[in-house]
Amino acid sequence: MTDSLSFAELRAHVDQHYAHQVQCLDSGRFEEYAATFTHDAEFQHTPGKEPARTRAGIIRELHTFHERFRGNPVQRRHWFNMVRLEQRVDGAYDVTFYALVITVEPGVKEPVIGPSCFVHDVLEIEGGTVRNRSRRVEHDQLL
């Protein structure tokens, strides 16, 4: 599939994948978010925690992580930018990008920005479908 795509077409597929992911994540649709990963994916986003493995593990991790917001009706928005794609020997893609998380509380005009992160993904593209094989998030404040 990717051999026949131009770079612009590949980038459009990847951008749509990430747009779908963040909208699922930000609206609490964790099962749909996890479905954007391969069945055996690895997902590491919390500093000091072991990565979640498999879609079911990703769903559990996200529910556990978001418990901290229970009773506090914040809206979180993930912003991905500066995406770089590099094809691997196995046909998958190493992707790196910057991510910002913006949190808004009801009635408060100014958002809280952070964390700022550097993200490493491995993407598989098959039959026009993009899925994460893995995601590793590095938090800038820990550098």
Predicted features by range, described:
Residues 26, 38-39, 125:
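Residues at helix-coil transition
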Residues 10, 14, 26, 51, ...:
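Aromatic-acidic/polar surface patches that form glycan- and anion
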Residues 30-98:
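A solvent-exposed, acidic/Ser-Thr-rich amphipathic alpha-helical stretch
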Residues 1-35:
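Short, low-complexity N-terminal intrinsically disordered segments enriched in polar/charged residues
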Residues 4, 68-143:
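A beta-strand edge to alpha-helix "cap/lid" segment located at domain peripheries
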